[in-house]
């Protein structure tokens, strides 16, 4: 589970302005951190199907945000993908 300190660190790393918390880069970075955290959870709890549904929903939301960013600004998209280590 992400702590508030982790969340603030991610926001500070990917924000575009002083008080930016809603840009696609920040949203994708936060979703990626939550997805990675849940993947570690599933290594220990293989039968947790309820949380798996939430994981799939987060992955789909992240994919939609990445598609939006790719159409809006390809440079920001490629930078974000390389920073997060996502394969697309």
Swiss-Prot record:
It comes from the Bacteria. One of its GO terms (biological process) is translation. Keywords: Ribonucleoprotein, Ribosomal protein, RNA-binding, rRNA-binding. GO terms for molecular function: rRNA binding; structural constituent of ribosome. InterPro entries: Ribosomal_uS15, Ribosomal_uS15_bac-type, uS15_NS1_RNA-bd_sf. One of its GO terms (cellular component) is cytosolic small ribosomal subunit. Belongs to the universal ribosomal protein uS15 family. PANTHER family: RIBOSOMAL PROTEIN S15, BACTERIAL AND ORGANELLAR, SMALL RIBOSOMAL SUBUNIT PROTEIN US15M. Part of the 30S ribosomal subunit. Forms a bridge to the 50S subunit in the 70S ribosome, contacting the 23S rRNA. One of the primary rRNA binding proteins, it binds directly to 16S rRNA where it helps nucleate assembly of the platform of the 30S subunit by binding and bridging several RNA helices of the 16S rRNA. Forms an intersubunit bridge (bridge B4) with the 23S rRNA of the 50S subunit in the ribosome. NCBIfam families: S15_bact. This is Small ribosomal subunit protein uS15. It comes from Psychrobacter cryohalolentis (strain ATCC BAA-1226 / DSM 17306 / VKM B-2378 / K5).
């Amino acid at each position: 589970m992400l702590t508030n300190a982790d969340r603030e660190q991610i926001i500070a790393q990917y924000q575009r302005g002083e008080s930016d918390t809603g840009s696609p880069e920040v949203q994708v970075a936060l979703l990626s951190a939550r997805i990675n955290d849940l993947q570690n959870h599933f290594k220990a709890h293989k039968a947790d199907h309820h949380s798996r549904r939430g994981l799939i929903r987060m992955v789909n939301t992240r994919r939609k945000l990445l598609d939006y960013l790719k159409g809006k600004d390809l440079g920001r998209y490629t930078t974000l993908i390389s920073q997060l280590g996502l394969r697309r």
